[in-house]
Design a protein with these regions (language model features):
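Short, Lys/Arg-enriched N-terminal segments with co-localized hydrophobic residues
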Residues: 1-17
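A helix-coil-helix interface module used to build multimeric assemblies
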Residues: 18-213
């Protein structure tokens, strides 16, 4: 099918021991475990592994399209990423909480599986670019999920409001009882609030799409 795959979808289940840090060669002896713990971000960035692998798949396809890596390397990278995704989803592979970060985990696991082609994946991409992309993709995915929940909640509220058009209750202003309203009318006030929240998420997501690296 060529090197065009741009999405890898996985579910995270737990944790692969990464014994080697990328910067280990700078030191003449083992780094204190407290330093490793301070530097490690795997505890919170492992939730971005699906987005990290998705971004890596697209980056590999771009490198192949520009002739920077071969089609064979790209296909190996995509196949390797897919195998990692499958093994994580099935529980055959776990992410070690002692791994430094999710990016190193993916890169080293991929290289162990497909060889030198895995090392070429990082060509033309800084780690900061990768982190920025992962964060934006993750936030965008979370935003879409929250939007779907809000839409469903608004639907439920509207349905309940329609069922309570004759249920009279007091309206309030400045915490004081005011004119009579229906319970359905009161519910629709919350639907309007949630609709504004939905619009804010939509605006934020549009910014993520426009500014995504």
């Amino acid at each position: 099918g060529g090197c065009t795959k741009d999405r890898v979808t996985i579910e995270i289940k737990g944790t692969v021991t990464m014994a080697e840090q990328l910067w280990k060669g700078r030191f003449s002896k083992a780094v204190d475990s407290r330093v490793n713990d301070f530097n490690s971000s795997i505890r919170f960035d492992q939730r971005m592994i699906a987005q990290d692998m998705r971004g890596s798949g697209v980056h590999a396809a771009m490198l192949a399209k520009q002739g920077i890596i071969s089609e064979k390397d790209c296909e190996d990278i995509l196949s390797g990423l897919a195998s990692i995704a499958d093994d994580l989803a099935s529980g055959a592979l776990e992410i070690d909480p002692n791994a430094e970060d999710v990016h190193t985990f993916v890169e080293q696991t991929l290289t162990a599986r497909i060889g030198d082609a895995g090392k070429r994946l990082h060509t033309g991409r800084s780690r900061n670019d990768q982190v920025a992309l992962d964060i934006r993709l993750t936030l965008r995915d979370y935003s879409h999920t929250l939007q779907a929940y809000i839409v469903e909640l608004i639907k439920v509220i509207c349905r309940k409001a329609a069922e309570n058009t004759t249920a009279v209750m007091p309206g309030y202003t400045h915490l004081q009882r005011a004119q009579p309203i229906t319970f359905g009318h009161a519910l629709m006030a919350y639907a309007s609030m949630l609709l504004r929240d939905l619009q804010r998420f939509e605006d934020a997501t549009a910014r993520m799409d426009a500014q995504c690296p």
